Amino acid sequence: MALNLEDKKAVVAEVTAQVAKASTIVVAEYRGITVGDLTKLRAQARQQGVYLRVLKNTLARRAVEGTPFAELAEQLTGPLIYGISEDAVAPAKVLNDFAKGNDKLVLRAGSYDGKVLDVDAVKALATIPSREELLSKLLFVMQAPVSGFARALGALAAKQGEGEAAAA
């Protein structure tokens, strides 16, 4: 269905708003993917907080114009699906994981921190743990010595309690 000028302006405004908040954009070619598979991909993206959109490349170029993602415009050819997120790794992770199980979805490029990423860089970005995972690992590492110390004190107190009970 063709979009009229007002619809196109609305789409560009919506995508521009998402791009303004984003730290990463990943694009993938979706040629030949079924509607059911695309629906599953959208659901996975929604769960991870990724804005996923099939968009005409001309409209996408206009949306990234004047942003740190402007250099990505050269990569926008063919039928593409755009993953946009504030989380640096989420779009790469969602699209890469889905592409592993569906050969019809092919990663094409990405952009992070104003730099255009090739396919290998997008795949590498997808392997990085998310911010929440890193924070939980850091918390675990910080808590481990404290909990070990607390267990040692508890064992020492129990041992002294046994010694006093035997002396009485």
Curated annotation (Swiss-Prot):
Please state the gene responsible for encoding this protein.
Answer: rplJ
User: One Pfam family this chain carries?
Assistant: Ribosomal_L10
An example GO biological process term is: translation
The chain's coiled-coil residues are none
Q: Which interval of the chain is the signal sequence?
A: none
Q: What is annotated about its quaternary structure and interactions?
A: Part of the ribosomal stalk of the 50S ribosomal subunit. The N-terminus interacts with L11 and the large rRNA to form the base of the stalk. The C-terminus forms an elongated spine to which L12 dimers bind in a sequential fashion forming a multimeric L10(L12)X complex.
* GO MF, any single term: large ribosomal subunit rRNA binding
SS bond partners: none
What organism is recorded for this protein? Answer: Ralstonia pickettii (strain 12J)
Keywords for the protein's UniProt record, in alphabetical order: Ribonucleoprotein, Ribosomal protein, RNA-binding, rRNA-binding
Q: What is known about what this protein does? A: Forms part of the ribosomal stalk, playing a central role in the interaction of the ribosome with GTP-bound translation factors.
Descriptive protein name:
Large ribosomal subunit protein uL10
Family listed: Belongs to the universal ribosomal protein uL10 family.
Q: Which domain of life is it from?
A: Bacteria
Which SUPFAM superfamilies does the record cross-reference, listed alphabetically? Ribosomal protein L10-like (SSF160369)
| One Gene Ontology cellular component annotation held by this UniProt entry | large ribosomal subunit
